[in-house]
């Protein structure tokens, strides 16, 4: 990323997080298709897609095993795994909440402390990769307890 440092934005509820994303996306105008909303899981992405579409925001899913149509209109929606290797003008990493980042299920599968540390490192790298997909702007959105991994992308 070559722009400003990541901006952490905290919201009291999911609805207010969605409202911020909707306003942000609409404010981008013609550049909306150069921005991407990134989530840790497909389930969270589905929840945002439904809420954004209800708010009148055009969206475009960047799907696994499919090339992105760069001329299709709409805010890009993708999981952290899917954005590897891609770049966008702007990124909003949504739902960067404890339990989602790191993904609690991923940590629960660890059989011992060493495996848990490795799972935490994988999650931290995934967040870092997502944050570095932006050329100009990264927003990290929280609507709950913040992820303990946030210092990995925004500093202490």
Predicted regions and their residues:
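Short, charged/polar "capping" segments at the starts of alpha-helices
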Residues: 44-47, 146-150
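Short, glycine/charged-enriched secondary-structure capping and boundary segments
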Residues: 50-54, 106-108, 153-155
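Helicase P-loop NTPase motor core
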Residues: 1-61, 66-70
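Positions that flank functional sites
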Residues: 67, 145-146
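Conserved motor-coupling elements within RecA-like helicase/translocase cores
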Residues: 65-76, 80-84
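Conserved helicase C-terminal RecA-like lobe
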Residues: 31-34, 78-143, 149-151
């Amino acid at each position: 990323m070559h722009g400003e440092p990541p901006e952490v934005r905290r919201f009291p509820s999911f609805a207010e997080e969605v409202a911020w994303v909707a306003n942000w996306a609409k404010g981008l105008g013609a550049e909306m298709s150069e921005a991407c909303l990134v989530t840790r899981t497909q389930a969270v992405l589905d929840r945002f897609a439904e809420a954004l579409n209800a708010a009148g925001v055009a969206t475009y899913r960047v799907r696994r095993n499919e090339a992105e149509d760069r001329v299709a209109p709409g805010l890009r929606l993708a999981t952290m795994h899917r954005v590897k290797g891609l770049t966008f003008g702007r990124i909003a990493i949504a739902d960067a909440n404890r339990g989602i980042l790191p993904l609690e299920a991923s940590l629960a599968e660890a059989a011992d402390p060493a495996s848990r540390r490795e799972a935490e490192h994988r999650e931290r790298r995934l967040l870092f990769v997502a944050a570095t997909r932006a050329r100009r702007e990264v927003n990290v959105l929280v609507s709950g307890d913040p992820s303990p991994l946030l210092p990995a992308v925004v500093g202490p």
